[in-house]
C-alpha cells in the first residue's frame, strides 16, 4: 500500500474526497466520502493515478482490466501511460451482440484496476468474470482501499492486492 499525500490532497482539492457524515451504498455510515468518478474526469488527477499504477503493475501482463463504470477511465489512462491494451468488464451479460462481458483482449495475463474497494464485492465479481474466461489475474490495484474487508475477501483468490491510498491516509488531518 502506498501512502500518497499528493494524491490525497488532489482528491480534496477537486472535492472528490469530502469529510462529514455520509451514508454509503452499503448503508454503512462514514465520516468521509470518495467520489472517484469526479476525480477521474480531471486529467491531472487521472494522469497522477495512471503514473502511480504504472509503477506497480507486473512486467509480464498482456492487458489491463477494469469493470464499468468507475474503473474504465483508470484502465484507459493506464493503457495510454504504458502502451498495454485494456479490456472493459461489463457489469452484466448483454442480451444482444456477442453477449460477452469482456470488451477487448481476453487471453493471457492481466492486472485488474478499480477506483474504490470497500467490501471487495465488485472486485470479486470482476475477478470471477476474468477467471471464468481462463484469464490469469496477476495483481489487483485500487486507488482507494476503505479498509472495510476488501483485502480479506480477496485473500482467498491468492492474488496480490494493492492500493494507492488506504482509509488511514484519508483521516481528516
Predicted regions and their residues:
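Active-site-facing substrate-recognition patch
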Residues: 1-57
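Phosphate/pyrophosphate-binding loops at sites that engage ATP/ADP/AMP, CoA/4′-phosphopantetheine
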Residues: 51-62, 127-133
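Structural detector of well-ordered beta-strand residues that form the stable sheet scaffold
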Residues: 64-65, 87, 138, 162
